[in-house]
């Protein structure tokens, strides 16, 4: 009869393998538990608490001030006057704006996946009824949900597009975070990927490449001056001074210039960089 001796060479090998397996299982379990560093990094921020106070440029003057050099030059024949509005403007006097020469408008539709502008119908339909070409924009909060989720919410709540000659492609407002960390707690690569997700989803839903609203200063700080969008997405740039100034990487020209936040009737005034025919072409796609 054979005797199992304590010095058998096989038992330690089996014990080591068992211990290694247990350790591997424990490590895998720990990595998958909530509250770990990886999970915490993916936890969404709370939904916006004052979305009615967030509009295109609401953070620009606060962070960048007004550029030296005074008022912008007089409009040229190759430009079209426009405005942008949100709920903070309330019911807008569109006939007054039309009579002053305003011919296009952007209207805030949504923020994150929880807010819709309560004045959207009056502003979006009112500008259209006055004769203007108009479009909608989304105020991005990249730390609350994915780019795809926010693009879908935008399209479902007023941000769609139709080839009627009066509807501009939707716009994505990327600017300083009104709720905390300037770059929303994301890395440059993380923000770029979030925007790619948003733009791809918007195009899949509407067939159009959306406009990007951003300032050169924020863009440099938060995306590392990425050149990923300049060849496709028209640039809407805020700068309150006598010229557009330096553009973000990737763009050789701007499409819309938000040149003041203190203009008549609604505050934010813009100039389209081209003739009325070119503005219609942008609307028609």
Task: Please report, for each region that a protein language model flagged, where it lies by residue.
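Flexible, glycine-rich phosphate/dinucleotide-binding loops
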Residues: 114, 143, 219, 244, ...
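Catalytic domains of cell-wall/extracellular-matrix polysaccharide-remodeling enzymes
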Residues: 166-250
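Functionally critical loop-and-helix segments that line ligand-binding/catalytic clefts
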Residues: 42-89, 95, 228-285
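Secretory targeting and sorting signals
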Residues: 2-41
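Short alpha-helical interface patches
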Residues: 6, 10-12, 89, 94-99, ...
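Ligand-binding grooves and catalytic loops that recognize ribose/phosphate and carbohydrate rings
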Residues: 26, 130, 146-152, 272-275, ...
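Short Asp/Glu-rich motifs
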Residues: 13-16, 116, 146-147, 222
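Substrate-binding cleft of extracellular glycoside hydrolase catalytic domains
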Residues: 75-205
């Amino acid at each position: 009869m054979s005797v199992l001796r304590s010095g058998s060479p096989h038992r330690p090998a089996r014990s080591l393998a068992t211990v290694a397996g247990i350790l591997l299982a424990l490590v895998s379990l720990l990595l998958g538990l909530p509250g770990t560093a990886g999970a915490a990094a993916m936890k969404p921020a709370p939904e916006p608490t004052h979305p009615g106070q967030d509009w295109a440029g609401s953070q620009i003057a606060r962070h960048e001030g007004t550029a030296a050099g005074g008022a912008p030059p007089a409009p040229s024949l190759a430009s079209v006057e426009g405005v942008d509005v949100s709920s903070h403007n309330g019911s807008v006097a569109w006939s007054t704006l039309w009579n002053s020469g305003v011919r296009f408008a952007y209207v805030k539709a949504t923020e994150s996946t929880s807010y819709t502008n309560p004045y959207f119908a009056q502003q979006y339909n009112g500008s259209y009824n006055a004769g203007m070409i108009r479009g909608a924009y989304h105020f991005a909060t990249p730390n609350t949900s994915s780019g795809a989720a926010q693009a879908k919410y935008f399209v479902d709540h007023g941000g769609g597009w139709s080839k009627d000659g009066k509807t501009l492609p939707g716009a994505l407002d990327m600017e300083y975070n009104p709720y905390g960390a300037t770059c929303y707690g994301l890395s440059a690569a993380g923000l770029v990927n979030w925007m790619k997700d948003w733009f791809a989803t918007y195009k899949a839903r509407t067939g159009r490449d959306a406009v990007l609203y951003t300032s050169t200063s924020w863009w440099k700080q938060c995306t590392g001056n990425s050149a990923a969008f300049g060849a496709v997405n028209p640039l809407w740039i805020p700068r309150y001074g006598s010229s557009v100034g330096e553009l973000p990487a990737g763009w050789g020209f701007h499409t819309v210039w938000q040149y003041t936040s203190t203009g008549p009737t609604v505050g934010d005034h813009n100039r389209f960089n081209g003739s009325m025919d070119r503005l219609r072409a942008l609307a028609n796609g």
